[in-house]
Each structure stands twice: as structure tokens, then as C-alpha cells.
Amino acid sequence: MPDSAALATDPAAFRDAAGDATAPTRAVVEARLPVTDPFAAYRRARGDAPSFHYETTGGSDGWGYFGVDPASMLRADGAGALDTVQAAVGARLARVGCDVPHPGGLFGWLSYDIARELEAIPDTTTDARGLPRLQLGVYPTIAAWREPFTPGDDLRLIAAVPVDEYTPDGAFEAGRDRVQSLAAAIRDGDPAVGPPPADSPAPFESVAGRAAFESRVRRIQDAIRDGDTFQANVSHRLDAPAAVHPVAVFEALRDTNPAPYSGIVEFPGVDLVSASPELLLARRGRELTTEPIAGTRPRGATPAEDDAARAALRADDKERAEHAMLVDLERNDLGKVSEYGSVAVPDYRRVDAYSEVLHLVSEVTGRLRDSCSLRDAIAAVFPGGTITGAPKPRTMALIDTVEATRRGPYTGSLAAIGFDGDATLSITIRTLVRRAATYHLRVGAGIVHDSTPAAEYDETLAKARALVTALGDAGGIGRVADTTPDNS
């Protein structure tokens, strides 16, 4: 590895951009550093500060990011969480030739419970874990890279410098120093996270249990028959006490379950390890995209079995009806903030393959109205309709009556939000939450009139399998206990 990163930003172009600033502005200094593996670079650089690493695995095109030393942390415990986000973005960003979608910004997670400030949802669940509604780090300095990544490719080391705090020359020097400091941390840092725990770990156990989950399914089906909802996503939580470091779990998960929205967030009091397949919202300028997933089949053991499962998924009347309903819901959500006539479905009902399951996926797009902000766009689609149901407000109220505990980060978002307001937010499904040496894994299923309760419970365990296996590979117990409690 070189002793320092090679500067890619032209100093004269940077000074011109900084000197032309007429409003609070950040300007980008970029350097390049070839590495073997971005995650290995993250492990060396992370240290003890709040940090994150996002990547697109499995061969998908995209961008990866990591940050290891935030300028500050944002946390919201009550109403106004999305206002906190909006207040932190909107700067005029001078990219100075940088093509990275989010060259610095806010990275972290949003809780499903932000929905309580967007809709009138009765607060009938408990919150024993005491998690905030939002936890984001403000990262002016990050590393980014193109996916898929080939060993020897460049990391883009980026500093988004607030130029109004410096002279143009001083701003460039500050950015140069920041990217070289990150390069030094990558070169000299210690990647160790400690040995696997010596104590005997325990398997995952469902907090609810099979019988209670199946009872939840039947209660939702009663509500469907009464006309209160058409479809609802019902979940339960699996818990496993384990001292395994989340970095080790994420490293195992990268191999067992590559996903387009994978990441680890190591923040005060809570760690997230995510392998989400689902995009909640992407904003690029005024262009908006969401990609709802609705419809699941287990992978086959052979290519022929996979092909048969794909065909069965596409042909299944229940899955087709559920998918169509949720695509319509997402079209309606984007329509709340999009220019009239701009909402479209350019990709409908494709089948995407993951390590354990196949999914039906569609793409819905729109163009954000000039009068609407990033906060408005997030509020329009949050939380995702595929993990609530339709109609969304009434269904979220029903979910609250059947689920005993708050969801927290589950079905919220893992967020990358640029200082300019461009953003990428996944839905935090297939996500482990670690708090106080216990891993929590919440999994759910979409319930419709003709769902089979036992089959829906089995589907939730299929969705959990890759993450349960990853914890086992890292030193925990890679299974769900056969005997689980029955807590309605």
C-alpha cells in the first residue's frame, strides 16, 4: 500500500469553487488509495470512534462507503426526527469533479417508530430496549468505492470541507490533511477485534414463539375479513445472548448472504449488522426511486430447482396479487411528492436471487416536486409499504395491536444522506441489532386472506437463516431453538 493517497482534486479548480461560494457550501477534496478489500481497510481504520461500513455485495453495481470519525452524532428520541435530518442537509455542494453519489454526509439508521410522528398510530407496544428513533453520524470525511470491487481498485478518500470556515487555500489544505489522515489510519491501524468468546453461546429463541405468531396471523386475517386491511406484514423477534463482535458477524455475513444493501453500524449503545435486499428510497437531484419487494420462495438445491421455484413464484396467484397491491401503494406514496404524471413503473415483477430465497421485485420512479424537500420524500414512503401493508395507516395501527414489542430499527432504514440532500435509504430487514451483549433479529411475513399461519412462520425462519448462520460462523450458535416460548 502506498505511504500516502494520490490527490485527485485539482487545487485550482477547488480554489475557484471555494472562492465562488455565495451560501453555506462544502467543497470536495478527493484522493485515491489502492487497496485489496475495502472492508479490510475499514477494519484497520475504525478504531474506537462511532463508525459505519456500507457495501453492495453479490456482484451488483453500486457504491460502497465507510466512515470512522464523525464530526458529531445526531440522535432523536421523540417527535421531530425527520426535521433533525432536514436541518442537517441542504448545503450547496461543490463536487470539483467528484462523481461519488454521497461525498460525505449523514450515515446511520432510522427507526420504524418514526412512523408514530407521521401517522396516528396507537402506542400499545412496549420498548424495553430503550432505542432512539434516529441515530446518525455526521461524516465530512469518508471512503467510497465502486461496486463490484476488484482487489487493487482505488478507494476514493473524500473530505467535504465547509469552505465558509476557511480561506480557499485553507479549505484545500484542510481537506488534503483529512484525506491523508484517513489514508494513514487505513495503512497503520489494527484490524483485530478480539478472539471469539470462550463462553458457551446460546441459540436464538423467538420472544413470541410459533403459537403466538400464528395467533397474530389469524388476528390479521380476521381484520382482513372485516375489511380493515388488505394485507399486513407481521413480525416476531429472535434473541440470542452472544459476546461475538459485530465485525466478525458482518465478515461472515458477507460470505453467506451477499445483498445489495449490506452494512455494519457501530454506534454508542447499539450495533447494526444488515444484509437488506430492499431499497426504500433513492434521491438523485429531483429523481426518486423505490424498489418494493413482495413475494418470496426458498432457493432450490440445484439450478433446475431454482428455475422451478422462479416459475412457481411468478405464477402464484397469492404472490402476484400481493405484489400488485404493494406496487400500487408505492406508486401512491411517491405520487404524494412527485410531479403530476411523473410516477412510472419501469421494471415490474422481476425475480431476484439471494443466498436463501428468491424475491419478486419492482421499480417505481417519480420526479420530486420543486416545493418538496428530502424530509417530505422520506415521510411519503416511510416506513415501506412492503413491511407494513395496505392501506398503510390503518394497517400500521393493526400491527401495533398484535406485536407486543416495538420494532426499533427493524423495517426502518439504513441511511446514506449527502450534505446536498441526495440520499439512499434501504429497509432494515435481514438485520441483526446488538445491544448489551444480546443480538436481536426480527423477521416477518406478509399476511393476506388465504395465508397459512404455519407456513408464514416457517417463511420468517427461512428469512432469518442467513443471519443466524453468520452469527454461528462468527462464534455464536447458528440455529433457532426448537422449543420457544408462547407469549402472545
Curated annotation (Swiss-Prot):
Keywords associated with the record: Amino-acid biosynthesis, Aromatic amino acid biosynthesis, Lyase, Magnesium, Metal-binding, Tryptophan biosynthesis
Coiled coil: none
Amino acids binding L-tryptophan: 260-262
Biochemical pathway: Amino-acid biosynthesis; L-tryptophan biosynthesis; L-tryptophan from chorismate: step 1/5
Pfam families the UniProt entry points to: Anth_synt_I_N, Chorismate_bind
Domain of life: Archaea
Enzyme Commission number: 4.1.3.27
Residues reported in the UniProt entry to bind chorismate: 295-296, 410, 430, 444-446
BP-aspect Gene Ontology terms: L-tryptophan biosynthetic process
Subunit-structure text: Tetramer of two components I and two components II.
Name of protein: Anthranilate synthase component 1 2
Record organism: Halobacterium salinarum (strain ATCC 700922 / JCM 11081 / NRC-1)
